[in-house]
Amino acid sequence: MDRTTIVSDINALLHITAGCLANWLDEILPRVTDSWWEDCVLSSLSYSQREVAENRNFSKLSDFDLAALLRIADKSWYDMRTVAYLPTSERECVRDMISVRNNWAHCSAELPDKDTILRDLNIILKFAQQVNCEHAVYSKISELTAFIEKPGSIAVPPQRAE
């Protein structure tokens, strides 16, 4: 497996978890208030995210990307706690996912080190379980984790002579 495949596989997992998060939020947010779309969704977005949502006439959570969905979950956390049991550790996982998403959305030409990749995969797995992704997603994450854990799975690039 080459570097491009690793980046591609992790981004595919992030895309899948975005769908799971949209479904999870769809189960909770409408119970918070009748005006949940304005109060919990649109008001949670950054200026640019809200502008995109309005310009493209977003009308459902699945219209949003992972960054926006994570922001909605984080900013609406206390509102959601009024209708669902949501431990603080799960909010911490949402915040960890924001970092993971940023790591891979802004991945440099160099692949992150093995420990970073494994940490990110562990967070993705924990998050996927939290938002009730299908078990097939857990298997994909576990398979990629097992591959990355193998010695020599990620070749360290040679040092350049200065």
Predicted regions and their residues:
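Amphipathic alpha-helical interface elements
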Residues: 1-162
